[in-house]
A protein has these predicted regions:
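Expand to "…catalyze enediolate/carbanion chemistry for C-C bond making/breaking, isomerization
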Residues: 1-250
Length: 250
């Protein structure tokens, strides 16, 4: 009688709705005047390089793995410690930005130009692109909603993931839904306009991991308010546990 192979497998991963939010939010500098919320959804802070250089001794600006440094001035040698650096440039200066060599990953926010062309150039250079979801109400053809949808549609096919700029809890949810739609090949515009929260809560752990590998972080100006609104909107996310995490910027 032929033997029957015995296949041993580990336990199936348990769905945890909280994992999608853990370490996702990045607190923008405007919130640093007040304490940044000590919350598992906060994965770091976004600070201007000029503030880092001027206030290097400030406790709020201590070097840390979670700090995103926005390049508003020329950096000294050596550059300050950072999880990543972010530069905002118009399309005509994109090539100069892509040629920068820094001691941490670079996030490139390019205003203007063809969305597809810019996204492909940033990814090909080994950097991380930015998707702005702060004006999704602009649904005109070629407007902000279309540009965000086009950028997120490409996100699943890139090698380096994207960084999102948002202002509200609704925009954070829309960004998550847009990334999931991109990974699934669904209509990203529809996902941004009418995000399916129930579907986000049902995501398999592998899908959560894939989503967070694409969505590196969501920068918000008022994280405490966003956290409170997210908890109200989606109670299943409110019990956020204690672990911290985030997308890999490398």
């Amino acid at each position: 009688m032929p033997s029957v192979p015995l296949v041993l497998s580990g336990p199936r991963p348990r769905r945890d709705p909280r994992a999608l939010l853990t370490g996702l939010l990045v607190a923008r500098e405007s919130e640093i005047a007040d304490p940044v919320p000590d919350h598992p959804w906060i994965g770091g802070t976004s600070v201007r390089a000029s503030s880092v250089l001027a206030e290097a001794e400030s406790a709020a600006l201590e070097p840390g793995a979670g700090r995103i440094v926005r390049l508003d001035v020329e950096l000294p040698e050596p550059a300050p410690a950072a999880r990543a650096f972010r530069i905002d440039v118009p399309r005509e200066h994109l090539e100069d930005a892509l040629a920068l060599t820094l001691p941490a990953p670079l996030i490139v926010r390019c205003t203007g130009g063809d969305v597809v062309e810019v996204a492909q150039a940033v990814d090909a250079a080994g950097h991380h692109g930015v998707v702005d979801v702060t004006a999704l109400e602009d649904a005109a053809p070629g407007g902000a909603a279309d540009r965000a949808a086009d950028a997120l549609s490409l996100a699943a096919h890139g090698a380096h993931g994207v960084y999102v700029i948002a202002e509200t809890a609704d925009q954070v949810i829309a960004a998550l839904a847009g990334v999931v739609a991109s990974l699934r090949g669904d209509d990203v515009r529809d996902a941004l306009a009418t995000p399916d929260v129930a579907a986000l809560l049902r995501l398999h752990p592998d899908a959560v991991e894939a989503t967070r590998s694409v969505l590196l972080g969501v920068e918000v100006p008022h994280p405490a308010a966003v956290i409170a609104d997210l908890a109200r909107r989606v109670p299943e996310w409110a019990d956020a546990g204690t672990s911290r995490g985030g997308g890999a910027l490398e």
